Amino acid sequence: MIQRDIEYSGQFSKDVKLAQKRHKDMNKLKYLMTLLINNTLPLPAVYKDHPLQSSWKGYRDAHVEPDWILIYKLTDKLLRFERTGTHAALFG
């Protein structure tokens, strides 16, 4: 099993607090994060995991819910949770 360092951006922490305030089911986010931490790849198709482009090149996007996404970066040595939120909040 690959062992990676795990990082959380400062903005990710703020995004999580906002999701909690909006009464999102945080267990869904935690489960997706656990899959990534445990290197359960590829992710199940329900998460619609895909690479991002443009200014987010090098990052990936997985859907917690249809309009709630997790942006993360995965390398051989690092798993970085960058952002979470709606498409409009993150890309709009």
Swiss-Prot record:
<dbReference type="GO" id="GO:0003723">
    <property type="term" value="F:RNA binding"/>
</dbReference>
<protein>
    <recommendedName>
        <fullName>mRNA interferase toxin YafQ</fullName>
        <ecNumber>3.1.-.-</ecNumber>
    </recommendedName>
</protein>
<dbReference type="Pfam" id="PF15738">
    <property type="entry name" value="YafQ_toxin"/>
</dbReference>
<keyword id="KW-1277">Toxin-antitoxin system</keyword>
<feature type="active site" description="Proton donor">
    <location>
        <position position="87"/>
    </location>
</feature>
<dbReference type="InterPro" id="IPR004386">
    <property type="entry name" value="Toxin_YafQ-like"/>
</dbReference>
<keyword id="KW-0678">Repressor</keyword>
<comment type="similarity">
    <text>Belongs to the RelE toxin family. YafQ subfamily.</text>
</comment>
<dbReference type="GO" id="GO:0003677">
    <property type="term" value="F:DNA binding"/>
</dbReference>
<keyword id="KW-0804">Transcription</keyword>
<dbReference type="InterPro" id="IPR035093">
    <property type="entry name" value="RelE/ParE_toxin_dom_sf"/>
</dbReference>
<keyword id="KW-0694">RNA-binding</keyword>
<keyword id="KW-0805">Transcription regulation</keyword>
<comment type="function">
    <text>Toxic component of a type II toxin-antitoxin (TA) system. A sequence-specific mRNA endoribonuclease that inhibits translation elongation and induces bacterial stasis. Cleavage occurs between the second and third residue of the Lys codon followed by a G or A (5'AAA(G/A)3'), is reading-frame dependent and occurs within the 5' end of most mRNAs. Ribosome-binding confers the sequence specificity and reading frame-dependence. The YafQ-DinJ heterotetramer binds the consensus sequence 5'-TTTGAGCTACA-3' in the dinJ promoter; DinJ also binds DNA but not as well as the YafQ-DinJ complex.</text>
</comment>
<dbReference type="GO" id="GO:0004521">
    <property type="term" value="F:RNA endonuclease activity"/>
</dbReference>
<dbReference type="GO" id="GO:0006415">
    <property type="term" value="P:translational termination"/>
</dbReference>
<comment type="subunit">
    <text>Monomer in solution, forms a heterotetramer with antitoxin DinJ, with 2 YafQ-DinJ dimers associated via the N-terminus of the DinJ antitoxins (YafQ-(DinJ)2-YafQ).</text>
</comment>
<dbReference type="InterPro" id="IPR007712">
    <property type="entry name" value="RelE/ParE_toxin"/>
</dbReference>
<dbReference type="GO" id="GO:0006402">
    <property type="term" value="P:mRNA catabolic process"/>
</dbReference>
<keyword id="KW-0238">DNA-binding</keyword>
<keyword id="KW-0378">Hydrolase</keyword>
<keyword id="KW-0255">Endonuclease</keyword>
<keyword id="KW-0540">Nuclease</keyword>
